[in-house]
């Protein structure tokens, strides 16, 4: 396929039109990496590679956008990416990149959740573990994160009893 035109679209995105009236939207980095310009010929394999690279970049940017607001576990982020992009290989590549740069860290996320559930919300260990399980933190990671809070359970129970039943205890 031959590229007919490359026009600026929005921000750093460009619209690339091919001779069969097919159009795709690519980021400037993808255009420069693959040398996309008007008049250039691409075979189907190279075009698929360009589209895959573009989708991978979009997925990574989407993941960073989501991480701007709150932390995610590996499982949560993978599920969100898979719902949007429907490509397991692409999602695994993006997740590996996020883990390697330290954006996704299940141990850190589990420690933050444990503190939130036990200290702030006054949940018991079982409920905190169940909530962490729903968020994608499983097994030993959840156990290790909750370990420092086992001795706080009695304090939490006393506080809850005092708060809820103090009028009956007089």
Tell me the role of every PLM-derived stretch.
Residues 1-170:
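An alpha-helical, amphipathic repeat domain used for nucleic-acid recognition
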């Amino acid at each position: 396929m031959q590229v007919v035109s490359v026009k600026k679209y929005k921000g750093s995105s460009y619209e690339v039109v091919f001779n069969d009236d097919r159009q795709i939207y690519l980021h400037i980095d993808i255009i420069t990496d693959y040398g996309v310009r008007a008049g250039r010929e691409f075979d189907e394999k190279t075009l698929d590679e360009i589209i895959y690279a573009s989708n991978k970049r979009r997925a990574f940017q989407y993941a960073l956008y989501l991480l701007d607001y709150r932390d995610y576990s590996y499982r949560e982020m993978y599920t969100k990416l898979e719902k949007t992009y429907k490509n397991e290989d692409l999602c695994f590549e993006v997740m590996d990149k996020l883990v390697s740069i330290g954006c996704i860290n299940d141990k850190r996320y589990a420690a933050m959740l444990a503190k939130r559930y036990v200290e702030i919300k006054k949940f018991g260990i079982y409920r905190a573990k169940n909530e962490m399980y729903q968020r994608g933190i499983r097994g030993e990671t959840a156990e290790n994160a909750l370990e420092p809070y086992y001795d706080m359970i009695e304090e939490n129970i006393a506080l809850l009893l005092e708060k809820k039943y103090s009028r009956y205890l007089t």
